[in-house]
């Protein structure tokens, strides 16, 4: 076991496990902008969150990944964040993943106690004064080797257990021992004569004063009482240490026993997983590492195999238990091994959740296509954990550059997020939230969503311009790569006149690159009209449908239609927020008049 552990470098424990996608050569790092703008992760995606409520009332607290990787365990939550690291253009891997996830029903999920193991890890991570609290040898030469010596630990543990008896018998031992020493020297003295002489000598030392207490003298009585109390206190300390040692031994035994059962069941899970994925070439490197780790874990399980099941049988293996507890606390390789097992179990839980959703909420992607075509797609945060029956589905064919207009709250931004999330998801796990999906895999994915009001010293427009320039630089640098660029409200941080002009120029520039596909939302209708007049064949205008009903109330269909919107709906938002009627009326009159010349 020591050799197996020594073969693995000790890095940060949580980062030792890697998802299969991280072993690929053809992988791309997902930018932090996309992760933040799409809200792929949130504070719920960490290993300490035990309250992952799936109730739809709490959907606002869930990240997008929470709808993909359902998790009721600490380990499943802890590993979610790693999925956001990469996406891939390796179609073979994505197809293998689809088959693997579908077959997860065939794997026998041996039960594991995540919370118990997590508590154990928290205990061994807090190893302050560990040696002192657990009565190990410390601050002496070779103490580390001593604490890992099974025979020495057996004798030392026996001494700790016997300490109360030794303390109780020590005075008697002190009185009798000189008799044997004297007789061994050939001195002829009877036992009676020895104790008579001992009694006389002891009267001459302070402790011997107890033998002739003057019960009429307060000082004599006080001295006797102090001496007796000191002896009793010494006995109390010895008994307390013995009880503490026993509690620690029982706790340590329970810890090792729980770890053994957990790691054994984890090995069974690993064997089952390798059996399912062994024929998938793209998983070969992951499986090789997994197999090596499995041997390491199995070796540790074998070491713990002869642990007594009952705490009453601990004395038989007391030295071994002490050594293994010490190694668990002090050897980082053991912690690394447990973390790897935890992360694997979290990964297994995540992909099992995907398998359960495939064919229901999620559908496998088809990658044999020249352009992406998502049919019946939806945004999972709107639907929640139920099937998409009562939500408007949309189709998006990304065979050209698209500009989408529409009134406020008509669903423009949600449409962009839906496309972006489903494309990313399809290039991570091979499926997405749609009825049918054809994905032309993209080498580079860029987004421009939720630009912050300030970026360091930048104004909003400067932050927007900086993000757009970064995208230009990437397109110029990787002209042989396929790019998908998603922009929400392009250049909205400046006045409408300049925003329309710069947006028009930017879109025309980007649309010249045949390897780039643009999806853009905007409120600047004059920019859309200008692009239409310029007869840019690579650009198509769409809008999110909305209309006024007979009661002059805005109705949102959330359907994507061809053409530029003709509806103005900003004032409708003010109505819905119960603005003063005078504000709504004056704003409406100015809009209907087409200018503000008549305002007072």
Model-derived regions, located:
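Intrinsic structural disorder
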Residues: 1-13, 61-68, 79-85, 90-93, ...
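ATPase nucleotide-binding head domains, primarily ABC-like/P-loop NTPase cores
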Residues: 354-600
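Alpha-helical coupling/stalk and coiled-coil linker elements that connect catalytic or binding modules
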Residues: 2-50, 56-407, 414-444, 477
């Amino acid at each position: 076991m020591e050799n197996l552990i020594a073969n693995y470098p000790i890095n940060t424990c949580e980062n030792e496990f890697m998802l299969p996608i991280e072993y690929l050569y053809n992988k791309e790092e997902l930018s932090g902008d996309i992760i933040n703008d799409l809200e792929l992760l949130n504070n719920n995606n960490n290993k300490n969150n035990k309250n992952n409520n799936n109730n739809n009332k709490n959907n606002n607290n869930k990240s997008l990944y929470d709808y993909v990787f359902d998790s009721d365990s600490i380990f499943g939550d802890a590993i979610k964040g790693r999925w956001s690291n990469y996406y891939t253009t390796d179609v073979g891997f994505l197809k293998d993943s689809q088959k693997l996830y579908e077959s997860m029903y065939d794997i026998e999920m041996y039960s594991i106690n995540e919370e118990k193991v997590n508590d154990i890890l928290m205990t061994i991570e807090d190893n302050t004064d560990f040696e002192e609290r657990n009565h190990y040898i410390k601050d002496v030469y070779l103490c580390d080797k001593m604490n890992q010596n099974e025979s020495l630990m057996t004798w030392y543990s026996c001494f700790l257990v016997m300490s109360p008896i030794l303390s109780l018998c020590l005075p008697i031992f002190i009185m009798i021992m000189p008799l044997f020493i004297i007789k061994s020297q050939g001195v002829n003295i009877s036992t009676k004569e020895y104790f008579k002489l001992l009694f006389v000598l002891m009267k001459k030392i302070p402790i011997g004063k107890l033998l002739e207490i003057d019960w009429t003298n307060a000082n004599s009585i006080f001295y006797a009482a102090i001496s007796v109390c000191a002896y009793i206190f010494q006995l109390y300390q010895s008994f307390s240490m013995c009880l503490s040692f026993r509690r620690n031994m029982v706790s340590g035994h329970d810890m090792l026993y729980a770890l053994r059962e957990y790691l054994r069941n984890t090995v069974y899970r690993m064997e089952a997983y390798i059996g399912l994925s062994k024929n998938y070439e793209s998983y070969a490197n992951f499986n090789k590492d997994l197999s090596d780790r499995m041997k390491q874990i199995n070796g540790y399980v074998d070491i713990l195999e002869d642990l007594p099941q009952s705490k009453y049988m601990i004395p038989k293996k007391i030295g071994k238990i002490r050594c293994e507890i010490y190694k668990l606390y002090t050897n980082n390789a053991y912690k690394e091994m447990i973390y790897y097992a935890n992360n694997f179990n979290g990964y297994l839980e995540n992909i099992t959740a995907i398998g359960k959703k495939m064919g229901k909420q999620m559908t496998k992607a088809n990658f044999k296509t020249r352009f992406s075509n998502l049919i019946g797609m939806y945004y999972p945060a709107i639907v929640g954990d139920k099937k998409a029956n009562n939500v408007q589905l949309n189709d998006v064919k990304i065979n050209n550059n698209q500009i989408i207009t529409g009134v406020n709250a008509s669903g423009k931004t949600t449409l962009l997020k839906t496309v972006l999330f489903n494309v990313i998801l399809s290039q991570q796990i091979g499926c997405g939230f749609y009825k049918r999906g054809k994905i032309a895999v993209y080498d580079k994915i860029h987004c421009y969503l939720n630009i912050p009001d300030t970026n360091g010293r930048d104004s909003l427009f400067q932050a927007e311009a900086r993000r757009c320039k970064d995208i230009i630089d990437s397109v110029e640098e990787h002209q042989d790569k396929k790019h998908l660029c998603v922009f929400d409200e392009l250049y909205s941080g400046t006045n409408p006149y300049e925003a329309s002009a710069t947006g028009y120029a930017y879109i025309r520039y980007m649309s010249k690159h045949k390897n780039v596909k643009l999806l853009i939302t905007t409120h600047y209708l004059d920019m859309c009209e200008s692009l239409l007049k310029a007869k840019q064949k690579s650009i198509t205008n769409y809008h999110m449908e909305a209309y006024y009903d007979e009661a002059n109330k805005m109705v949102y269909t959330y359907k994507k239609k061809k053409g530029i919107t003709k509806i103005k709906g900003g004032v409708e938002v003010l109505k819905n927020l119960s603005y003063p009627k005078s504000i709504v009326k004056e704003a409406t009159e100015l809009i209907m008049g087409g200018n503000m010349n008549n305002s007072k």
